[in-house]
């Protein structure tokens, strides 16, 4: 059992617990949000659910080496990394850089992602925190992807060239 992949999976699970709570609360307290805001939040929750599957499978693979198939881990970690970076970009782009404590003076339109709750400032802060933890989750998945690539290459998953001449015995 290797320690570094195990620590990475636990870090991913901690970030996922926090993200599930934050984004789940945004969904639960949704009151007449715009369609584009709902789509961004729902996509983020889809990415979180996918990340749960990858992190739990990675945790099982880190504990039980017989389950760890390097190519499968590589594909799972690559997919989770890709979806996490897309969700982080979507949340950051849709949110912008607001002052969540002073939304009255902001110039955002009625379709802005933080509008659509009884307490828009709370929703704004939860989405801000969700964006930060999505980027932290990306760092953890990127590290796991790097380890998966190294493991895949170590087990002979890549094409290696070696000496092709055989020794001639006279």
Task: Cite the ranges covered by each PLM segment.
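Intrinsically disordered terminal tails
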Residues: 1-6, 66-67, 108, 112, ...
């Amino acid at each position: 059992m290797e320690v570094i992949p195990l620590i990475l999976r636990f870090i991913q699970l901690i970030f996922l617990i926090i993200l599930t709570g934050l984004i789940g609360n945004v969904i639960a307290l949704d009151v007449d949000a715009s369609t584009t805001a709902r789509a961004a939040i729902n996509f983020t929750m889809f990415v979180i659910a996918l990340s749960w599957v990858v992190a739990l499978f990675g945790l099982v693979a880190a504990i039980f080496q017989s389950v760890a198939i390097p190519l499968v881990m590589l594909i799972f970690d690559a997919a989770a990394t890709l979806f996490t970076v897309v969700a982080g970009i979507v949340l950051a782009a849709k949110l912008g850089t607001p002052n969540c404590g002073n939304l009255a003076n902001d110039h955002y339109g009625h379709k802005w992602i933080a509008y659509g709750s009884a307490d828009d400032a709370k929703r704004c802060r939860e989405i801000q925190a969700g964006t930060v933890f999505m980027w932290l989750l990306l760092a953890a998945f990127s590290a796991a992807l790097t380890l998966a690539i190294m493991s895949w290459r170590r087990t002979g998953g890549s094409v290696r060239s070696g000496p092709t001449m055989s020794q001639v015995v006279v």
